[in-house]
Amino acid sequence: MSASQLLSSLTQTVGEKYIITDPAKTEQYRQGYRFGEGKALAVVRPGSILEMWKILQACVEADVIVITQAANTGLTGGSTPDGNDCDRDIVIVNTMRMNIIQTINNNEQVVCLPGSTLNQLELLLKPLGREPHSVIGSSCIGASVLGGVCNNSGGALVQRGPAYTEMALFAQINEEGRLELVNHLGIDLGDTPEEILTNLQGHHYQKKDIKQDAGKGHDHAYCEHVRQVDEPTAARFNADPARHYEASGCAGKLMVFAVRLDTFPQEKQTAVFYIGTNDINELTDIRRAALGEFESLPVSGEYIHRHAFDIADVYGKDTFYVIKKFGTHQLPKLFDLKARVDRFGKKVSFLPKHFSDKAMQFVSKFLPDHLPKSMRDYRDKYEHHLILKMGGKGVDEARAFLKEYFSHHGGAFFECNAEETQAAMLHRFAVASAAIRYRSVHDDEVEDLVALDIALRRDDRDWFEKLPPEIDNKIIHKLYYGHFMCHVFHQDYIIKKGNDCMALEHEMLHLLDQRGAQYPAEHNVGHLYEAKPALKQFYRKLDPTNSFNPGIGKTSKKKNWAE
């Protein structure tokens, strides 16, 4: 099948409205959120999973590459082309029109189709007294449920571990190049692909069709695993073979039509403790006690260094206000609006580069102070900050421990009221985008960002990084923050103009190798990191012809994995 014949077939399947070939209009699908860009023959937006299957059939017949893409919010370019050096044309299948979520088993599980988002799932479950796997961070900017599963995404919630399921419906191309539909959802939906996909889309199945022993719907072992604080290995990271299972961790090497996931009861009684210290050993003691000794695991434990606090204070202020005013559920629309403004700005010669960021930063100067006095006082007194959230019996447990511990140590804590709780959580969220804003506003002095996503050994007591001067003097600002209980850190470095960011990153990664760290921890390899041998092997097993998302993890982009 020629390229023109393929385009004709795809148009017949989805209609002219939902196939895009104009490079100017496909840019938002071909370009990653932070990283990655390349050409594509077409972007196709199916409205049903049966259309998605027909698109894939045509692409296999035409021998083209297929990149399945949902929200395209990944930070490492994992759902876009990267460069133009593939040996076949690329078709991007964007799944966001297929956003159906079905609750099953008394709301204790959900079946999510490819376009469903974490944000949407959270809203659906809230009145039912349930929660999804993730309720912070990526859920706020529109990330998809399936994107999280396919990339073993982590998150702030200690008790739930990385996104994981053993129940999925997916398409695979076998070694002979034949397309197969595999139903491991544990739901009897019929025999043919057409029956299975149509019945699932329309929720044409009953309770008796649902198997209760079809597999795990989340990582059951993580609660005990994270408690092993003396183990010389990381708690969670993307290349961990223990969390690779078909769709889970597949990174687009399968086309996934649906996943079945567990939901979780809402934590009724919670409290947030804001902890400050100038001694990293004190935070280490708290982490080891909370994980190794507390009866109740923390809900979350988020670390912020003073310098990250300061950058977010200035460059995340408007983000803070927007979420406080409109709520996280409006953020996807606002991010989409921002992207539209930026695309318009590129076409208008007199507007500055990064127009929307510079405009919002200017406006933020006139906003009133947004942080409570208690947090500002701790910023002045203490270098290291920990936001510890506990639930149920863990509230009294943590309160008693912290009171006794700080009676004879140099740091301090306070229990947050409602306003302080909201401010602490929003400020932590604002840190994540502050470095990007800084880069956009100061593009005349910043070369670029180096953003590392790392998992330290669970027994690593010397967790705070000290860079050698030859690296440190090339950096304007360092932002350290992360999921402290899991020992997962996000480290954003704003690099001075004129330096080689890739070379600097390699030097930093070499230092992390010496410390026994793993990377990436939760953003997956995308086209930014090299996949470890076990991960490469997993990808080859899933996709022996290398037809899905080739080049991921710096692997071969050629058919049948040719070098």
List where the protein language model places each region:
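Short, conserved secondary-structure transition motifs
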Residues: 143-150, 302-318, 424-430, 524-537
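C-terminal cap/substrate-recognition region of VAO/PCMH-type FAD-linked oxidoreductases
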Residues: 255, 260, 271-278, 282, ...
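General beta-strand structural signal in soluble alpha/beta enzymes
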Residues: 19-23, 45-46, 66-70, 77, ...
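FAD-binding subdomain of flavoenzyme oxidoreductases
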Residues: 119, 126-282
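Anion-binding (especially nucleotide phosphate/pyrophosphate-binding) glycine-rich loop
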Residues: 83-98, 103-145
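N-terminal flexible segment immediately upstream of the FAD-binding catalytic core
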Residues: 1-61, 74-110, 261, 308-317, ...
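Conserved glycine-rich FAD pyrophosphate-binding loop
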Residues: 33-41, 64, 69-71, 76-88, ...
